[in-house]
Amino acid sequence: HLLRRAQEPSNAADMAKIKDSDQPKDCLQYGDEAMTRLLKQKKLPKPSRIASIQEGDDEAKKVWKEIQDSGIIPKDVKQKKGQTGEGGATNMGVDDNGYDSSKDPDCWWTASQCTKPKHNNKGMMPDIYTCPEPSTFGLTFDDGPYCAHNEFYDYLKQKKLKATLFYIGSNVANFPYQAQRGLADGHDICVHTWAHRY
């Protein structure tokens, strides 16, 4: 799936030198040996597929069981069922036609912009959606990393800005050097699902 090209950068520092104006050079597939090995050994889920704990990953299974047993995830939280209606699915594959917030046990921001969980779980805090300090803002970016992000990272660096970058696991597998650059530049990195199917 990931190809190695002799003329392509082989590390994050070399990849950072490529600019968007060099496209499609910065978007040619490249193969990081460690990432390619992890994918071939099935240590990572297949890119762009809904992830599950990999077979034989006993540590991950143990951690997942600890999370479930801790009670931090309310027992009544259920995955919204996806429906494909006329013209395709809505809200990342979840149909909100006829959605009634009062009957939903969850706080579904996509449908109602609610910010406070309805569950009686002490560990579930309301969403942070405002910055109470005047002239302050939070800077976040979703769905990275992407092959053409070098100029984006350069811009943030030039403006002396740090951001929270929500990376999709499949994108990290496909563009590991861009992911490393975000981390090396001092940004906060958060997981944004493996495949962004919802």
Residue ranges and their predicted role:
Residues 1-2, 141:
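Acidic/proline-rich low-complexity IDRs
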Residues 2-131:
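Non-catalytic propeptide/linker segments at domain boundaries
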Residues 71, 78-198:
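Active-site beta->alpha N-cap acidic-glycine motif
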